[in-house]
């Protein structure tokens, strides 16, 4: 096998079969590619420097014409791609995506789109890897509740700040990270924003609040001062925040997030390989009712202001 790994991303694009009757379930979008004469799920190669999420949303929009609300991660599919006589490994990152608006227009690359029930989609898909991915989607409910657990952005050094620590603001790097988080987190269409009552936490989500016109509510239980002794309250808050099928953003601190994640994943018997919590990073937590189904880590956005 020669050549480097091809990175790609895509989505299982779904919508309710009947918006007024949830019991009728969902249907998914399957596309036909005339070049290969196959039926597949929408996906494509990442552009240079493009993140997996940005690439997935761009490719789904380009191939289907639909804007989406990002849902839970569906993991990777891996296979070998033959290109010009060279075999190269290909890794595709996938997300569940709810169609929110759009219209399909045929192109040279995709000449047909069908909205079909899950069983029919499984029979129609040409590649085994796509069928396996659809099975992953089916194993979890489509309309899940999402909590985006964000660590505050860069705020300089605690030792260099002469005022009360809870008043320490974001630095230039932190403001750049906060601005970039708007683009990332807006893909999930948050309907509620909660922050620890520390200035650097509220400032981290202020740009998102302005862009989404969603107010920021503070809750001291997510702060390093309010969390000790109230751990059970914080876990309970995570389980109910955002409503039955909404998306909430919670901005917290590095002394809180690892322990909070460990408590809720242990309680729901979900194993994490590691619990990272870098400044401006995000954990995407997906729930069915109040039970945690998945936890996926998104590293901090890369911004020039933080390169020095």
What are these regions (language model features)?
Residues 37-38, 104-157:
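Nudix hydrolase/Nudix homology domain
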Residues 44, 55, 143-229, 258, ...:
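Active-site-proximal alpha-helix that buttresses catalytic centers in soluble enzyme cores
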Residues 46-69, 77-129:
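Unchanged
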Residues 67-76, 214-219:
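A short coil-to-beta-strand element that immediately follows conserved catalytic motifs
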Residues 126-132, 136, 262, 266, ...:
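Non-catalytic terminal regions with compositionally biased, polar/charged low complexity
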Residues 235-293:
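Active-site-adjacent alpha-helix immediately C-terminal to a catalytic or transition-state-stabilizing loop
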């Amino acid at each position: 096998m020669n050549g480097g790994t091809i990175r790609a991303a895509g989505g299982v694009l779904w919508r309710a079969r009947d918006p007024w009757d949830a019991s009728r379930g969902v249907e998914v979008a399957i596309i036909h590619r005339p070049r290969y004469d196959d039926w597949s799920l929408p996906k494509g190669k990442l552009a240079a420097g493009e993140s997996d999420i940005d690439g997935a949303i761009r490719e789904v929009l380009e191939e289907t014409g639909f804007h989406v609300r990002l849902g839970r991660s569906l993991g990777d599919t891996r296979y070998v791609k033959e290109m010009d006589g060279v075999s190269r490994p290909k890794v595709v990152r996938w997300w569940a995506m709810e169609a929110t608006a759009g219209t399909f227009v045929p192109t040279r690359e995709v000449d047909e789109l069908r909205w079909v029930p899950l069983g029919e989609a499984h029979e129609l898909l040409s590649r085994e890897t796509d069928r396996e991915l659809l099975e992953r989607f089916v194993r979890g409910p489509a309309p899940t509740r999402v909590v985006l657990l964000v660590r505050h952005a860069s705020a300089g050094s605690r030792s260099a700040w002469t005022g009360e620590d809870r008043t320490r603001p974001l630095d230039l790097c932190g403001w750049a990270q906060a601005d970039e988080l708007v683009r990332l987190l807006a893909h999930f269409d948050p309907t509620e924003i909660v922050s620890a009552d520390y200035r650097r936490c509220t400032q981290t989500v202020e740009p998102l609040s302005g862009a989404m016109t969603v107010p920021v509510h503070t809750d001291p239980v997510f702060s390093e001062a309010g969390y000790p002794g109230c751990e059970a309250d914080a876990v309970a808050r995570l389980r109910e925040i955002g409503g039955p099928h909404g998306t909430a953003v919670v901005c917290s601190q590095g002394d809180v997030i690892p322990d909070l994640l460990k408590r809720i994943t242990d309680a729901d018997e979900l194993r994490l390989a590691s619990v990272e919590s870098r400044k401006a990073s995000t954990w995407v937590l997906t729930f069915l009712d109040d039970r945690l189904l998945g936890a996926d880590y998104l590293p901090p956005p890369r911004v020039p202001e933080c390169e020095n």
